[in-house]
């Protein structure tokens, strides 16, 4: 049904002669666990929750029917959209322009994600093979996504991964400022009532 609705929008743009100068972006803020690993909510770093769709379409400005396995982040949407509009990207804007990724000339080696749930901030860094997760309690997890796609074996317990953990922890923690949220934050009270 959703594809059909998007198709209707594209058909209307074509009817009005607007398709060639309209950038279409489809994205999501999180994936869906659908009870995989026994989880049905979004507050997790399992791949099913953090791997999200991202589609950019604009005839003449972007390759047609191209598919990429490049890792990108939603934080990259704003600078990318500003560049498409030929608007200067302010210095305070985080993220990077994805245009080089669209052409394959530049691909990010790492992507990051973070969340703050019930006052427990967590951060994740991922490369093509490994995923590292760090919590405020200094608990870490490391998963080999090639050999353990279900993320069931935490390699952080194995000494042979110490160097990788140290490198990924440095990446994850670089520049991360954990906000101090008051204990009385209203959403915390609601979370505790579950």
Tell what function each PLM region has.
Residues 33, 45, 54, 67, ...:
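Conserved beta-strand positions that form and line the central face of beta-propeller blades
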Residues 11-63, 73:
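Histidine-centered active-site microenvironments of extracellular/periplasmic hydrolases
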Residues 30-36, 75-78, 83-145, 150, ...:
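C-terminal cap/loop subdomain of S1 sulfatases and analogous C-terminal strand-loop tails that border
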Residues 5-12, 80:
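Short, conserved SAM-binding segment of the class I
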Residues 41, 61-72, 85-89, 152-161:
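Active-site rim elements
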Residues 53, 57, 170-180:
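A short, conserved beta-to-alpha structural element at the edge of catalytic cores
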Residues 1-3:
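Outer-membrane beta-barrel transmembrane strands
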């Amino acid at each position: 049904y959703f594809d059909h609705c998007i198709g209707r929008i594209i058909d209307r743009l074509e009817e009005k002669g607007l398709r060639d100068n309209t950038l279409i972006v489809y994205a999501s803020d999180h994936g869906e666990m659908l009870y995989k690993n026994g989880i049905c909510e979004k507050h997790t770093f399992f791949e099913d929750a953090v791997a999200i769709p991202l589609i950019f379409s604009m005839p003449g400005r972007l390759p047609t029917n191209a598919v990429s396995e490049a890792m990108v982040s939603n934080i990259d949407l704003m600078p990318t959209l500003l560049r498409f509009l030929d608007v200067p990207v302010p210095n305070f804007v985080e993220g990077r322009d994805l245009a080089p990724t669209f052409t394959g000339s530049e691909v990010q080696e790492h992507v990051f994600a973070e969340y703050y749930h019930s006052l427990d901030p967590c951060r994740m860094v991922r490369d093509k093979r490994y995923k590292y997760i760090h919590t405020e309690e200094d608990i870490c997890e490391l998963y080999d996504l090639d050999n353990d796609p279900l993320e069931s074996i935490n390699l952080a317990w194995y000494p042979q991964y110490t160097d990788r953990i140290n490198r990924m922890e440095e990446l994850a923690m670089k520049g991360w400022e954990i906000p101090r949220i008051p204990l009385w934050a209203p959403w915390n009270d609601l979370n505790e009532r579950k």
